[in-house]
Amino acid sequence: ELDPFSGKIVVQKNGKKFVVQNQVPFPLSQEEMDAIYDLDYVRTYHPSYEKYGGVPAIEEVQFSVISCRGCFGSCSFCAIHSHQGRIIQTRSHESIIREAKKITELPNFKGYIHDVGGPTANFRHPSCAKQLKVGVCRDRQCLFPKPCPNLDTDHSDYIALLQKVRALSGIKKVFVRSGIRYDYLLADKNDRFLDELCRYHVSGQLKVAPEHVSEHALANMGKPGKSVYLKFMRAFNKKNQEIGLKQFLVPYFISSHPGCTLRDAVELSEFLRDIGHQPEQVQDFIPTPGSASTAMYYSGINPETGKKVFVARNPHDKAMQRALMQYKNPKNRQLVKEALQQTNRGDLIGDDAKCLLKISSSHNPKARHSKIAFNPKINKRR
């Protein structure tokens, strides 16, 4: 009922009272968006924070520009599409340029715009013309499980916007850091945006969010399959080779998402091994209000399919999934060992190149005193 065109008022009895959810408003027009962002904001934290030494991360926000609102990505673990809507609302180029010029006048501005984006940076218009006439589809999503045939994947407006901002006097570089949907980028048959992105708007590393590689884990997340990420990874690397730049992808992954089993976590760790990536930070799933994933976490049922899903609620189970993503960390050895034993993956313990847990002294200085071996009697499946 979150669609302004077809959504209804929802009433739920709660004791002797009723909870009423009114019909959601229509998306903001471009004129309304411009009016909001043209207000005279001070672009810094409240003076009360001075006694605490200020806010260290203020620059990331202070020198960033919001260009759009809403998201039609509909990831299961995200509630942005619920409270900002699936219909994209955008600011005009003129409004964004006015703000960028104001940023260049700030005393501590060093020439770098940290971001021009939003919930998803490369969503700069509604996903299809139909949305502005009859609303969003009630029985399907725009990008999952595959991009809709009616999806408008044209990136030309966003390209033109970035070109205008980076051409402004006083601006050395414009980055795109709020995240892009690489499946949406790949759906655009014209690779001009990828070329512009790699040439001008990556700060050496581009953060993307494949979230997982197990197909059924991704299905519960509402994310594209592993093959889509691999296709983007190849396209990104090829483009950077063409333009002579050394730039890298930094993929984000989630552990213990509802529907993700210990076997799925092992599959992810093997993928990380194969691409030579060890994440410094790992996002363990946290149930947050308003998301489908939270409903799965508490009910054990995927609300979209009605099917039961495995949920890792036990702290130890969650710790094993998390440890597998950082299997090279010495602190995680015991957890990784236990996880591999429980999934009957003793083939990943040893000194072979494919092994996640090394046992030789060259890899483990303490190996002589704490020998790790596979126990075939332990074969618990999750």
Predicted regions and their residues:
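Conserved, mostly hydrophobic/aromatic
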Residues: 36, 75, 96, 208, ...
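Flexible, acidic/Gly-rich N-terminal and inter-domain linker regions that tether
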Residues: 1-61, 328-330, 337-366
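N-terminal pre-triad scaffold of radical SAM enzymes
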Residues: 50-79, 104, 112
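Radical SAM enzyme [4Fe-4S]-AdoMet core and its adjacent flexible, acidic
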Residues: 36, 127-156, 219-221, 225-227, ...
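Catalytic cores of alpha/beta
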Residues: 192-193, 257-274
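Cysteine-centered iron-sulfur cluster-binding motifs in ferredoxin-type domains/subunits
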Residues: 64-76, 86-95, 99, 103, ...
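Conserved SAM/AdoMet-binding glycine-rich loop
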Residues: 102-250, 254-258
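Acidic, low-complexity intrinsically disordered tails
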Residues: 140, 356-382
